[in-house]
């Protein structure tokens, strides 16, 4: 979240956002005019808040293009990019309307003659990732479910990483199994505790559900104007990420840390 906030502060335009599970940050990018295309498998804050109303408005009005893939297909696109191959064969999306997106093609299995989907590789220009810890060489460790981050990092041309903790390389060597992103693919590393907030960072702090409730109520009441006010208050007004965290307060951050400890033991 720290890096996404900085991109918004720089008032970038014309970006394509690609993420398997796209959350409210995409709404911030749409309303701020930073993105004109979103490639995803799902978009919303979470089940309690339903389908993104902002996404519906911007897509249906033609202001933003949305390209929908299956969860597996997007994962395979990143995996193909990480492997350096042009596509990977799969059964995903066959027989669905999603086959019409992104120039998806089919091929014949040379062994059985069956029809397969040829899922094209995805090579992001820039990958923005957050990890639990990293050493000074950029070797990154992720606790819990690593999602697609390792493949995304290998597929991207430029990789920007924020980390909760900086560790000595001796610690990296002591637990090589935890290192899922090697330093040779990382271009920039920034130490940013709570860098994923108000989202969760497994084992360290939980997502601030109350904050998302407040945000969703603002969207329900004011639509895109509510999002614009949110961007002004949480992105442009705080001069630093520390100032941004001050908007939540230390007690609130500590509460999310306690919730994470309760869930992970």
Enumerate the predicted regions with their spans.
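Conserved alpha/beta enzyme-core scaffold
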Residues: 1-265
């Amino acid at each position: 979240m720290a890096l996404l906030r900085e991109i918004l502060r720089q008032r970038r335009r014309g970006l394509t956002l690609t993420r398997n599970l796209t959350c409210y940050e995409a709404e911030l990018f749409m309303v701020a005019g930073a993105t004109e295309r979103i490639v995803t498998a799902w978009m919303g804050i979470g089940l309690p808040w339903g389908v993104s109303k902002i996404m519906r408005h911007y897509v249906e009005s033609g202001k933003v293009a949305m390209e929908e893939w299956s969860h597996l297909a997007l994962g395979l696109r990143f995996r193909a990019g990480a492997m350096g191959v042009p596509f990977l064969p799969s059964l995903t999306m066959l027989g669905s309307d999603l086959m019409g997106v992104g120039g998806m093609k089919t091929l014949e299995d040379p062994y059985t003659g069956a029809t397969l989907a040829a899922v094209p590789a995805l090579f992001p220009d820039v990958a923005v990732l957050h990890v639990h810890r990293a050493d000074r060489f950029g070797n990154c460790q992720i606790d819990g479910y690593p999602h697609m981050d390792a493949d995304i990092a290998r597929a991207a041309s430029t990789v920007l990483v924020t980390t909760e903790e900086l560790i000595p390389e001796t610690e990296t060597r002591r637990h090589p199994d935890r290192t899922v992103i090697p330093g040779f693919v990382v271009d920039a590393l920034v130490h940013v505790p709570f860098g994923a907030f108000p989202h969760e960072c497994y084992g360290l702090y939980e997502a601030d559900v109350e904050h998302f409730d407040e945000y969703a109520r603002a969207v329900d009441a004011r639509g895109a104007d509510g999002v614009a006010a949110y961007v002004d208050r949480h992105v442009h007004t705080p001069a630093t990420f520390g100032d941004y965290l001050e908007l939540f307060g230390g007690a609130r951050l500590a509460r999310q840390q306690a919730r994470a400890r309760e869930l992970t033991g």
